[in-house]
Amino acid sequence: KVSGIDEKKFTVPPVAEPKLELLISKNQSEGRLTYHDDFGKVADKDVLWITMDTPVNDDDKPDTKIVFDLLEKSLPFMKQNILIVVSSQLPVGTSKKIIEFIKVRRAGLKFDYVYSPENLRLGNAVNCFFNPERVVVGTGSADAFVKMKEIFAELNCPILKMSAESAEVAKHALNAFLATSLTFAYDISDVCEKTGADILDVKKALISDSRIGAKAYLDPSLGFSGGTLGRDLNAILDIMKESSVALPVIASVLKKNTDRKNLVTVVLNREFGSLRGRLITIIGATYKAGTPTLRRSLPMEVKKMLEGHGASVKIFDVRAEGDFSKDPYEAAVGADAILA
């Protein structure tokens, strides 16, 4: 049985996900899932699982304060021999701080700690959870690993045991690798732009190679957004900066992504001479397809850039909440350019 602690008393998930509301409703009606706003409900639980999304600021810097706040509210009620699992995104080194925090704030508490980073994707979170390619369990406790294997027993995938620090770095490395793949695609796209080649044809050749593969992140977009990839890149850079270790590849990935987002204004200014007084229509407002969230979405960042150059912007999106056109034809009326 699962009890969710939810201070805001949400009756629906804060982010819409396919199948999620149905899954919640089914398990509530069958008595396996309850929600409370009382941290005292932790008292009889064998496992405390912290899953809050770690917020990032406008510079993609992560803030783990929410994780420590939740721990502090829960600690007085934890029973002995509890298993504490964190799946929120943590900069490497945070698990060590969490363990020390618990020992100081609740001296005498017997507990095991696991860092098991989530690997969900907005718009496909339920499917990702039930069909993972692997589960990473970062812990120094053999007992904790056995318990995690029992929890994940229904999942048909490898369960990888490692230290909490290795699990933290694995999460950073995965997103850094994906971001680096995208940055490579941006560079090749620039080559195509200057040589008359078609980046989509080049991409077909790349993904047909078994050493690269059809799932490779090679979309020649205007850059990655949403804060997820940037959060891990910045976390690695910040940690290594403290040790005076340079990471030129990862640093260049962040710079390329920033430069890439400016490409839209460069191209449109080249076409029109100036964007002042121009009407630009953007098709799609959300962070990615399949979700209504606007958090750090690329279209909204592009909108802000275009308006900064004096353009007016209309946006079409049928799912996003806000002042957006729900008719693509209406949104396109009078537009000097359409971005999709």
Task: For every predicted segment, state its role.
Residues 1-340:
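Structural/interface elements that position substrates and couple domains in central-metabolism enzymes
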